[in-house]
Each structure stands twice: as structure tokens, then as C-alpha cells.
A protein has these predicted regions:
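Active-site microenvironments that recognize anionic phosphate/pyrophosphate groups
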Residues: 1-130, 136-173
């Protein structure tokens, strides 16, 4: 496939003329399927998980970024689980897979920034309820990430540490 074409539509990079921030428009992204729980492709026997598993990843079938730079990470084969319910061992398996895939994607010459995040609920655009996250490998450093990096560099340490309660401070909620 040539250029930014994918089986799910054309990817178009745009720049906001007011802020200079880059974004990607995917023409057919809104045509992703909304599946009922009974037909979950992430459950064992489903399209993306033919066998039981503990944790797994695969290329996103509806990629928001072109060139194999979007992956889905399934946290568990249990449809009703959450990341918090995985326990230490399950969470460790997920984090290890995040690290492994981030390293692989980050080593690509066309990748400048790797973002790992969790998808949960329709409010954030998740079309499947099964516990999962995604990994995006950008060909540029997004503006917010660049700003955060600059702030870390200015402080020489985590700038949030100055706002965290110390061991002798009372935490107010």
C-alpha cells in the first residue's frame, strides 16, 4: 500500500495553524464496529484471541496511525476484568509487554515517540468493553510530551515532586 493508505482508510497529517500542533485524521475511523459482549473479538475463541491467553498484543485493525504504528494490548482473557483486578502478577505481565513493545516500536527509524494508554469506556472512544489498551508509535514528538520533557529538563528532576506530600506532611483530600 502506498503512502498513508491503510485497509481502513487514508491517514492525513494536519497542522493546526494557530498552535502548530500536529494531528492525524483517519477518514474511516468512525466506521469501527461496535460489538455486543457476546461477540467480543478479544475473548478466547474470538477473532483476535483464538486461544486462551494471559496477555497478548496485535496490530490495530482500525489504526489511527499508518505504517503498523498502532497496536492493541489485551490485559487478560477475562472479559469482566479491569487492570486493577489483575493482581500483581497479572499487572506485571501487562507492564512487561508494554515495555517490550515500546522498545521494539521505539527502535524503528520512523518512530520518535511511543505512547501507552488504556482504553476503557465509550467516553474515550473504546468500542469494545474487554480490558485493553493501545500503543501508538508517533513519527514526531507530540506538543504536550515535548512541553513535559522541557519542564523536566528545566528542573533537573520530576517537577511534580515539589507538589507531592512528603513523609512528614499531612495529605489533604
Amino acid at each position: 500500500m502506498a503512502g498513508n493508505e491503510s485497509p481502513r482508510g487514508t491517514h492525513s497529517a494536519r497542522v493546526d495553524p494557530l498552535t502548530g500542533e500536529r494531528t492525524t485524521i483517519v477518514s474511516r475511523r468512525q466506521s469501527r464496529p461496535n460489538l455486543p459482549d457476546g461477540d467480543c473479538p478479544f475473548c478466547p475463541g474470538g477473532l483476535e484471541a483464538p486461544e486462551p491467553y494471559e496477555v497478548r498484543w496485535f496490530a490495530n485493525r482500525w489504526p489511527p496511525l499508518p505504517g503498523g504504528r498502532a497496536e492493541v494490548v489485551l490485559y487478560t482473557d477475562r472479559h469482566d476484568a479491569t487492570f486493577a483486578s489483575l493482581g500483581v502478577g497479572g499487572a506485571r505481565r501487562v507492564v512487561d509487554l508494554w515495555a517490550e513493545r515500546s522498545e521494539v516500536l521505539g527502535a524503528r527509524p520512523d518512530v520518535d515517540y511511543v505512547l501507552v494508554f488504556e482504553n476503557r469506556g465509550p467516553a474515550v472512544g473504546a468500542t469494545i468493553a474487554h480490558p485493553h489498551g493501545q500503543i501508538y508509535a508517533y513519527d514526531h514528538v507530540p506538543a504536550r510530551a515535548a512541553t513535559e520533557y522541557d519542564r523536566f529538563s528545566e528542573h533537573g528532576e520530576d517537577p511534580l515532586d515539589a507538589h507531592a506530600p512528603g513523609p512528614d506532611l499531612e495529605r489533604l483530600v
